[in-house]
Regions:
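N-terminal export/assembly segments and adjacent metallocofactor-ligating motifs
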Residues: 1-279, 326
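Active-site-adjacent bridging/hinge elements
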Residues: 237-246, 333-343
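N-terminal leader/propeptide and maturation segments of large enzyme subunits in energy/redox metabolism
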Residues: 114-120, 279-325
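Flexible, glycine/charged-enriched surface loops at secondary-structure junctions
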Residues: 142-146, 280-286, 344, 375-382
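A glycine-rich, hydrophobic/aromatic-adjacent loop/helix-cap motif
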Residues: 328, 337-408
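Short acidic (Asp/Glu) and glycine-rich catalytic loops that position anionic groups and cofactors
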Residues: 246-251, 309-315, 339-347
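Non-catalytic, well-ordered alpha-helical scaffold segments
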Residues: 159, 163, 264-268, 304, ...
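Short linear loop/turn motifs
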Residues: 286-292, 333-337, 382-385
Length: 408
């Protein structure tokens, strides 16, 4: 039987094992082209390039530091109005996207069966010729509707060009994945505007967060972090409604734990208190909002309004039992939210991306509508559309496949 192992020997052995594993990992070949090594140090030619980060809809301003024409660092742009010099870890790591060995720098053609990673590079001329021939063949057969266009970042005029092209070609299958978290769909259904919301934390006096990772993976971490700075009487009060004690919940002024999948129910319960106690913006609701009260459709059928639905399904006792939050806490948070001067309710993709999440996000945004936080300082803002020039219609009239409206 071996000698007994004490605490000191055990820790030393574990440390040696970790060092060995780390050195072993370094021995593996990493497919990155090595940088040119100079025989002697020299300062190099430095250049700063101003741009925007496109890794999330915030589009923070960035500065890239180039040395001898090679990007070596990405930093926030202190002159940009959105992030004011701050930058989240994802934005800083954008340099890894540039140098990643799997990054596509041109068109490729699949050489293996679907699901494999076997591709070969083709020239731009060859790729454009193939696409043109395939589109022309579909259109000549009257089968233009079978074409599908998938696109990612389409800010500015690019999205309008794709919409006009798909409509002129004759396919309704245009999918623009600009805001795949569903936030733009929430604003489209509530306000008729297909755009992501912008939450004005700096001018708000209460932020009611439904699972939003404001200190971890928010769209614009610098803006959220900046709003948290300063003395408690000069920054908004943060209430985090969350299923776990996340980093954001730990830094909030109050954490309200709830059961998973009940964000929408909690929002409904808060709306119940706002309507019952009259803690909503009567003036804005009366002037700018439709559907709060019952209304009649074109056939004369009475459609229940938001007030009737909330008072029927958002009773405090029912929401308390379902979400696992006490009725006293629910009422207190709702009254604090309704009595604030510039409150705002927020959510993120952890809410809207899951199954049934769109309904939850709609319920949360309904709180902003009730307290008049839409299109107001300290509330929910929407970036106005880019004033791009109006494009002319198709030169050859209606396509063979039949022009149909594009959808997003």
């Amino acid at each position: 039987m071996g000698a007994p192992v004490g605490r000191r020997e055990f820790l030393a052995g574990v440390g040696g094992l970790g060092a060995g594993l780390g050195l072993g990992a370094l021995s593996h070949w990493f497919p990155l082209p090595p940088s040119d090594v100079k025989p002697a140090w020299s300062p190099g030619r430095e250049k700063l390039v101003t741009s925007s980060c496109l890794l999330c809809p915030s589009h923070c301003g960035i500065r890239g530091r180039l040395v001898d024409g090679k990007l070596v660092r990405i930093q926030g742009n202190p002159l940009h109005p959105v992030n004011r010099g701050g930058l989240c870890p994802k934005g800083v790591a954008g340099i890894q996207l540039l140098y990643h060995p799997g990054r596509l720098t041109g068109p490729v053609e699949r050489t293996g069966p679907p699901g494999t990673s076997r591709f070969r590079r083709v020239s731009w001329g060859d790729a454009l010729d193939r696409i043109t021939r395939a589109l022309a063949e579909l259109r000549s057969r009257g089968d233009a509707r079978s074409a599908v266009w998938l696109a990612g970042e389409t800010s500015g005029i690019m999205g309008e060009i794709l919409r006009r092209f798909s409509g002129a070609y004759g396919t309704p299958h245009l999918l623009l994945e600009d805001y795949a978290d569903g936030s733009a769909e929430v604003l489209k259904l509530c306000q008729g505007i297909h755009a992501p919301p912008a939450f004005d934390f700096s001018d708000s006096d209460m932020v009611l967060s439904f699972g939003a990772a404001l200190s971890e993976a928010w769209w614009c971490l610098p803006q959220a972090a900046r709003a948290r700075e300063g003395q408690s009487d000069r920054r908004p009060r943060w209430v985090q409604i969350d299923v776990r004690h996340s980093r954001t919940a730990a830094r909030a002024d109050e954490w309200v734990p709830v059961r998973p999948g009940t964000y929408g129910a909690v929002a409904l319960g808060i709306a119940y208190v706002l309507l019952r106690e009259g803690l909503y913006d009567h003036e804005r609701i009366g002037e700018r909002v439709l559907g709060i009260e019952d209304w009649e459709d074109a056939t004369g059928q009475v459609v229940p309004g938001l007030r009737r639905l909330v008072l029927r399904y958002g009773r405090t006792e029912d929401v308390s039992a379902r979400a696992g939050v006490s009725a006293e806490t629910l009422v207190r948070v709702a009254k604090t939210f309704g009595r604030a001067s510039r409150p705002v309710a927020v959510w993120d993709q952890s809410v809207s991306w899951r199954s049934g999440g769109l309904a939850d996000a709609l319920a949360i945004h309904a709180l902003n509508i009730l307290v008049g936080a839409v299109d107001r300082a300290g509330g929910v803002l929407v970036q106005p559309p880019v004033p791009v020039p109006r494009l002319d219609g198709p030169a050859d009239g209606a396509p063979a496949g039949g022009a149909v409206p594009s959808w997003i």
